[in-house]
Regions:
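N-terminal regions that are enriched for targeting/export leaders
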Residues: 1-48
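Local sequence-structure signature of Cys/Sec-based thiol-disulfide redox active-site neighborhoods
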Residues: 47-89
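Charged, often glycine-rich, active-site loop that binds/positions anionic groups
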Residues: 89-106
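Structural micro-motif
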Residues: 111-133
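Extended catalytic-interface subdomain
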Residues: 129-131, 141, 145
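Short, polar/flexible loop-turn hinges at active-site or ligand-entry regions and domain interfaces
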Residues: 141-142, 160-167
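Non-catalytic, surface beta->alpha helical segment in thiol-disulfide oxidoreductase systems
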Residues: 143-153
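Conserved small/polar residues in nucleotide/adenosyl-binding loops
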Residues: 168-175
């Protein structure tokens, strides 16, 4: 899996631990969807819960992405938040929208690679290109690429629209 450096894709593996162990880095895009669009615990405000405004990118090979799909279903958000699935087969360009290998294709812009969505948000982005990714179609920006925060948003931000006020996650991270 490669990464973007100043908006350019580099086909190189990112660092692992000395013993080859995977080191998960913190997500870099940490905005929040809230019922009224006010700022959440991190990031900027301006992301109000609205039907049809957001798009979720996932890989069915990623457990962190799976939990966003589970909360999307439990909270009845399927009609409100559409989804694109990247291919399970990661190649030299990272996550792809290769429909011959399990992808749904990019439903928004027909991109070939997920890294194109990251550079649409920030042409000089440096970092890993990860799923899940929550995209704001109105502002043409990444809301978040942190699964724990995405599920917290899904857990309560849209309750006023769906009427589903059941809570499935803790409201805030544990220390």
């Amino acid at each position: 899996m490669g990464l973007l450096i100043e908006g350019q894709w580099h086909d190189q593996w990112y660092d692992t631990g000395a013993g080859g162990r995977f080191k998960r880095e913190n997500a870099q895009r940490r905005n929040w969807i809230t019922a009224d669009g006010s700022a959440g615990p991190s990031g900027e405000g301006g992301f109000a819960a609205e039907a049809g405004r957001y798009h979720l990118y996932v890989s069915l090979a990623c457990p962190w992405a799976h939990r966003t799909l589970i909360l999307r279903s439990l909270k009845g958000l399927e009609p409100l938040i559409d989804v694109s699935v990247v291919s399970w087969l990661m190649r030299e360009n990272g996550w792809t929208f290769d429909t011959e290998h399990g992808s749904s294709g990019d439903a928004l812009d027909g991109f070939a690679f997920l890294h194109q969505r990251y550079t649409q948000d920030d042409p000089a982005y440096t970092g890993r290109v990860t799923v899940p990714l929550l995209w704001d179609k109105q502002q043409q920006r990444i809301v978040s690429n942190e699964s724990a925060e995405i599920i917290r948003m899904f857990n309560s931000a849209f309750d006023g629209i769906t009427g589903n006020c059941l809570l499935y996650t803790s409201p805030s991270p544990r220390d």
